[in-house]
Amino acid sequence: MLHKTRGIVLHTLPYGDKYLIVAIYTELFGRVGYLITPARRGKRGVAQALLMPLSLLDLEVEHRNDRDLQRIREARSLSLPTALQTHPAKNAEALFLSEILYRVIREKESDPPLFHFLFDAVRHLETADAGIANFHLTFLFRLAVYLGIRPNRETYVEGRYFDLLEGIFTEEVPLHGRYLNADESRVMARLTKMTFANMSLFAFSHTERSAILGHVLDFYRLHLPGFPELKSLEVLRALFE
C-alpha cells in the first residue's frame, strides 16, 4: 500500500553492491528501514544527495507488513539547498545528532510530537546564523523531554549538586558518586534555560562546552541502556576548538 509521509534521514548503510539500507524517522510510521536503489546514470532510483544525515524528505512509500525493509517510490527534498552540507559546523552537528538519534530512537510507531520537534530542530539548524556551537547542547536538553529523562530544574538552588542518576539537584552529595559538583551543577541548571531562540546568548569556552557535553552524554548513558560511545563526537569537539 502506498503512503505519503515526511521523514528525517538518520543513517545510511551499504547493502551489497547495488543497494542502501536507510533508517528514516517518519511522521506516519516512526523509525523505518528502507531498502533503496541509488540513482545511477540512466537508471531510476533515489539520489544519494537526498540521503545526507538529517535530510528532510517528502516521501511516497510502499509499506507491507510481511517485510522488514520497506520501499520508497518517490523522494523529494524538503531541506534548504546545501544548508547543512556546505557549512562545516552545521555538517558536524548533523553528523553527531543523527548518530545519537539513530541510537536512541527505536520505536516503530508514529510519535507526532517527537517528529515535529525533530523536524523543527533541523529547520533551526539550517537557518541559524549565530550560536551554532551551542546547537547540539540545546538539542540534547530538549530531546531529553521527549525521551522521558528530562533533568528536573525546579529542584535547583545555588550550591546544590546535580544527581546524574536521579536527574535532580540535591543538598547532600549523592553517595553513589554519579553527580556534578556545585560549579558544574550551576552550569547544568543554566543550560536547562537554553532554547534554539536564545542559544546565541550563552557564551562558553571550548573547555566548558566540551565538559558540559561530556556531562550530558553521561546523563544519557545512565538513563538509556545501551547508549554507545559516539564515533562523531571527536569530530564535533575538534571543530569547535
List where the protein language model places each region.
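Non-catalytic alpha-helical scaffolds and adjoining flexible linkers that form interface surfaces
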Residues: M1-E241
